[in-house]
């Protein structure tokens, strides 16, 4: 019997294994590590009848015993699409797919809304899911938001569950490049700035991956306020564009904009006040317009959209308001894993700002972020493995505020609070501008740690 080989015991690998097993496939999971966590996960899958092999590195030799029977190899988003082992498998005629492709196969009879972009996609995903759900639609979200797309596919196999009206799927560039068969009914592109270049090699390659998803969508919704997308408007003659910039109308076939009186408008007139979404920042106004355009396309009335926007509680780790401490507003923006996302946060919160930044640095243009440090930040506290890289950038920029550096975020938070009090900061902001993998499992774990620390300090 042909088998499906699943690479890795991460969230996506486990989800793909369980879904394919439920569909009747013979499944074998291969995992490199053999630690206690992997042992526990492996046993859970074995208890479900899924063969799991530990100590299998991502090398061609790990796959050879199954080559005659393999139907497909399913990889997690963290594995580069051009990994030498995957290329060798393809040379032997093996189909290599991402977990998202497995989910699409299970869920393609439901209309998808595919959401991508360098920054903003998680907020748009959560907000659109909320708006559609508040309007009475069954619109589960999954993908790059902490819930495996394959696990959603497995849930939807349950005959006791109603079929989704819409699937709201956040899709990273990693997930898109390994699932080119996905064709959303609605595609949303939030922003494009340099990110993941160490993986994709160039900005053009990164852009082309995201562009592919929108080209395969029946309806494309794009952000006219993004410089990169705006510069390529000729590529999208049939797209729906949105803009929060009141002077940005002429070059675009704008579907939605904000008028000088502060109302969201389309060609029929004003729909509702733009302040229906309480989240701070111009970027969140853009997110709100993208969600509104998609919700209108999905058949919602403006009144229903406004109700959903007004009741939205926000997104963890995205400018998450943690209250106040020593007279400072405290914000958890752990999701800001690059300079552009961190720059957005620096523009959104009240200044002067006591900033916490650091982690595992990424390639990218730091100039805009550095300028905002000069303009809005009274003190900077760095942490993590690449704190000295950031320190060098900050010093070279001529920044004159206080800068301190600590190995761990635990020590950094204590120092940042002291620096913020000293500098009369209005906001204490965790916006790392770096990935989290040097010290944390993911940005959620980093943000949860920060939130826990602030809550403990608030109780003292």
Residue ranges and their predicted role:
Residues 1-98, 102, 300, 457:
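N-terminal leader/targeting and accessory segments in enzymes
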Residues 3, 22, 62-68, 77-224, ...:
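Phosphate-binding loop of NTP-binding sites
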Residues 3, 15-23, 272-378:
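Nucleotide phosphate-binding/pyrophosphate-handling subdomain across enzymes
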Residues 20, 73, 115, 144, ...:
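Residue-level signal for inorganic ion chemistry
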Residues 26-34, 222-224, 356-357, 376-385:
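Short internal beta-strands
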Residues 27-31, 140-141, 168, 241, ...:
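Short beta-strand "acidic-cap" motif of Rossmann-like dinucleotide-binding folds
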Residues 31, 53-56, 97-102, 142-143, ...:
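Beta-strand->loop->alpha-helix junctions that form or flank phosphate-binding loops
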Residues 41-48, 367-426:
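C-terminal helical cap/extension that packs against the catalytic core
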């Amino acid at each position: 019997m042909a088998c499906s080989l699943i690479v890795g015991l991460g969230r996506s690998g486990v989800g793909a294994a369980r879904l394919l097993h439920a569909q009747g496939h013979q499944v074998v999971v291969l995992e490199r590590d053999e630690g206690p966590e992997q042992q526990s996960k492996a046993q859970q899958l074995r208890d479900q009848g899924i063969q799991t092999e530990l100590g299998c590195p991502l090398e061609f030799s790990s796959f050879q015993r199954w080559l005659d029977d393999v139907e497909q190899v399913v990889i997690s988003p963290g594995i580069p699409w051009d990994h030498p082992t995957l290329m060798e498998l393809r040379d032997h005629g093996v189909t290599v797919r991402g977990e998202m492709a497995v989910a699409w196969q299970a869920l393609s009879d439901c209309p998808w809304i595919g959401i991508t972009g360098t920054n903003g996609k998680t907020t748009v995903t959560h907000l659109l899911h909320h708006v559609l759900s508040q309007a009475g639609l069954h619109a589960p979200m999954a993908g790059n938001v902490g819930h495996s797309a394959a696990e959603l596919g497995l849930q939807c196999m349950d005959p006791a569950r109603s079929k989704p009206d819409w699937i709201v799927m956040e899709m990273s560039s990693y997930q898109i490049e390994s699932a080119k068969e996905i064709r959303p009914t609605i595609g949303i592109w939030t922003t494009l700035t340099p990110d993941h270049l160490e993986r994709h090699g160039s900005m053009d390659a990164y852009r082309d991956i995201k562009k592919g998803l929108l080209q395969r969508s029946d309806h494309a919704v794009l952000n006219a306020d993004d410089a990169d997308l705006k510069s390529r408007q000729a590529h999208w003659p049939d797209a729906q564009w949105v803009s929060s910039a009141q002077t940005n109308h002429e070059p675009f076939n704008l579907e939605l904009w904000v008028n000088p009186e502060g109302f969201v408008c389309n060609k029929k007139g004003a729909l509702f006040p733009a302040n229906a979404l309480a989240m701070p920042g111009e970027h969140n106004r853009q997110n709100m317009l993208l969600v509104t355009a998609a919700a209108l396309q999905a058949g919602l009335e403006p009144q229903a959209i406004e109700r959903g926007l007004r009741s939205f509680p926000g997104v963890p780790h995205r400018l998450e308001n943690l209250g106040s401490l020593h007279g400072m507003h405290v914000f958890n923006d752990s999701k800001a894993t690059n300079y552009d996302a961190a720059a957005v946060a620096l523009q959104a919160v009240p200044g002067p700002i006591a900033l916490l930044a650091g982690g595992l640095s990424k390639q990218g243009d730091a100039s805009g972020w550095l300028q905002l440090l000069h303009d809005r930040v009274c003190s900077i506290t760095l942490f993590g493995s690449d704190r000295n890289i950031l320190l060098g950038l900050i010093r070279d920029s001529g920044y004159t505020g206080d800068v301190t550096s600590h190995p761990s975020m635990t020590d950094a938070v204590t120092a940042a609070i002291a620096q913020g009090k000293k500098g009369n900061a209005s906001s204490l902001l965790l916006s790392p501008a770096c990935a989290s993998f040097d010290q944390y499992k993911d940005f959620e774990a980093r943000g949860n740690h920060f939130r826990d620390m602030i809550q403990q300090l608030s109780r003292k």
